[in-house]
Regions:
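N-terminal membrane-anchoring alpha-helices
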Residues: 2-59
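Mobile, glycine- and charge-enriched loop segments
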Residues: 47-77, 186-209
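Short, Asp-centered acidic motifs that coordinate Mg2+ and/or phosphate
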Residues: 93-94, 127, 154-155, 171, ...
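Active-site metal-binding loops of divalent metal-dependent hydrolases
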Residues: 68-73, 99-101, 132-134, 160-161, ...
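Membrane-embedded segments
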Residues: 62-157
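Conserved beta-sheet core of the metallophosphoesterase superfamily
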Residues: 209-287, 294
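Binuclear metal-dependent hydrolase catalytic cores centered on His/Asp/Glu-rich metal-binding motifs
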Residues: 138, 143-154, 166-206, 210-214, ...
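Beta-strand-turn-beta hairpins that frame and shape the catalytic cleft
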Residues: 53-66, 154, 161-174, 197-201, ...
Length: 294
């Protein structure tokens, strides 16, 4: 008797419904955004040190300047202990602050800035040049940040200059706080007088790199340190910064060391942010400028 043939019935696979596909796609997107957010948060709390070597025949021995900019009330550790420790380990001769350590939107909230300045001043003399957030808080919201920092024996500049001697080298520290658009009317006389006073090494502290888009390039500035541009906020591979205040898209001057005309200047990427757009691929930066004759 022949064996009976058996027929195998193959059931068609059920197609995944649109709803399930959508849920999976959304879950992947949420997971991706979550990972990206964690990476951004991690990056924005990692301090990066950027070293620059500047040569000058006006100095006797090596001078180290540590520069900070654009903290905008961000704290690295309790009472900025991580930031202070990093600066201390760098053994600076002076600490230069080039503005926007506060937030103009919180005109009376700057106790952390004063605390940081006091801690840094125990490491090395602090020289603080006002930025637009300090100026705007003072002019339009009656902030006492300038007076209160000055009361703590911190040298804070508002279109002022001071000569210091470091290891036998005389340095004229010039704090230019005027916005570049108002320079000709309110800042030029002060600046030119400070520049022509003597043949000392000229260290310019100003918040605005835009000064070097035409206004100050022909002056013999031995070194200027600026901030304001936040490194372009979002840094694109092979391109650089995406956007900076007062420069717009793809800013020319948002980070790094530059020589243009007779001037040498550094643009700090800064430490914090002032708006809702996060810093992306743009770690907070401590600038170290080593000035030497060799």
């Amino acid at each position: 008797m022949a064996e009976s043939e058996q027929t195998q019935v193959i059931q068609p696979k059920k197609k995944m419904g649109f709803g399930k596909k959508l849920i999976i796609i959304l879950a992947v997107i949420v997971a991706f955004l979550g990972v990206c957010s964690l990476m951004i948060v991690h990056q924005n709390n990692q301090l990066e040190k950027k070293f620059y070597q500047v040569k000058s025949n006006k100095v006797v021995d090596n001078i180290r300047i540590v520069a900070l900019a654009d903290l905008h009330l961000k704290e690295f550790g309790k009472d900025n202990e991580k930031l202070v420790a990093e600066v201390k380990n760098l053994s600076p001769d002076i600490v230069a602050i080039v503005g926007d350590m506060n937030l103009e939107s919180q005109p009376d909230n700057y106790s952390s800035v004063i605390s940081l300045c006091k801690q840094l001043n125990e490491i090395a003399p602090v020289y603080y040049c006002l930025g637009n957030h300090e100026i705007d808080a003072m002019l339009f919201k009656n902030s006492n940040i300038y007076k209160d920092i000055k009361a703590e024996d911190i040298k804070i500049f508002n279109n002022e200059t001071e000569t210091v001697n470091i290891g036998g080298t005389a340095i004229d520290i010039i704090g230019l706080t005027q916005n570049p658009t108002e320079f000709d009317e309110y800042g030029k006389d002060f600046f030119e007088k400070a520049m022509s006073a003597d043949d000392n090494f000229k260290l310019l502290l100003t918040h605005y790199p835009e000064y070097f888009l035409g206004k100050l390039n022909d002056y013999d500035i031995d070194l200027a340190i600026t901030g304001h541009a936040h490194g372009g906020q979002v840094r694109l591979p092979f391109i650089g910064g995406l956007y900076a205040a007062d420069q717009g898209l793809f800013p020319k001057l948002c980070d790094g060391y530059h020589e243009d005309g007779n001037s040498k200047f550094i643009v700090s990427r800064g430490l914090g942010k002032s708006g809702i757009v996060p810093r992306i691929n743009n770690k907070p930066e401590i600038v170290i400028a080593d000035i030497s004759w060799y």
